[in-house]
Amino acid sequence: MDYSELVSIRNNSVEEISSWLWVTEDNGAFDGPKSDWGPLKQGILDHVKNFDVVVQAGGNCGMYPRLLSDMFKRVYTFEPDPLNFHCLSYNCQKDNIYKMNAALGETNKLVRMQRVSMANVGGHRVSDTGDTFIPTFTIDQLALDKCDYISLDCEGYEPNVIAGAMETIAKFLPVITLETVNEEINMLLSPLGYKRIDGHFGHADKLFAVK
């Protein structure tokens, strides 16, 4: 599909990286993550012990997977929206970034996705009222040999993603950051020894680690 009328190059620098291909109408999914990256990066440096493998979702237009690729040897990023993924593919051309045009969830199935606003393309979400069907996979299906960090901003779908990652989490005990936290997540992570770490890791991210 031709997205040329919907995207443009944005020369705002993030960590000395510029020339981002981005959805022209969007500001929310660029400005917010850009300002959050500093405290989130510091949280990663403070709590992650090894920097081999990170799983990240949603990949959005590619800012965080691209930045994480300078910290980790391998980055697995998932982004279900075709337009966002088009930008992500342009922005994330490093060989250590593995890109999937799909969502993460608790099982392998098709779900509906709703596009919320082109002014914030990070707000697209899984919803029963969505008009687009997208595939979901589980983190456990990746059969990773290592996993040091899981970063999830899935617009409320985080409990489903964690449920589909329990084998991986139990095996490797990665540091986890989540935008949405509820009792279901606490019930999944607490038996493994996870604690929520106090601190500021961006405007909405919460960090969990085994201490």
Labelled PLM ranges:
Residues G59-M63, P82, E106, C154-G156, ...:
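Short, glycine/acidic-enriched loop or turn micro-motifs at the edges of active sites
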Residues F72-K73, K171-P174:
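A short helix->loop->beta-strand "cap" motif at the edges of active sites that frequently abuts
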Residues N101, S151, T177-T180:
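Short beta-strand segments
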Residues M1-D95, D128-T129, L144, M187, ...:
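S-adenosyl-L-methionine
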Residues F78, P82-N120:
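Core alpha/beta nucleotide-donor-binding catalytic domains of modification enzymes
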Residues E25, M100-A102, F137, G199-H200:
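Conserved beta-strand termini and adjacent loop/short-helix elements that scaffold enzyme active sites
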Residues D31-V55, L110-Q114, G123-F172, E183-L188:
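Short internal loop-to-helix segment that lines adenine-nucleotide cofactor pockets
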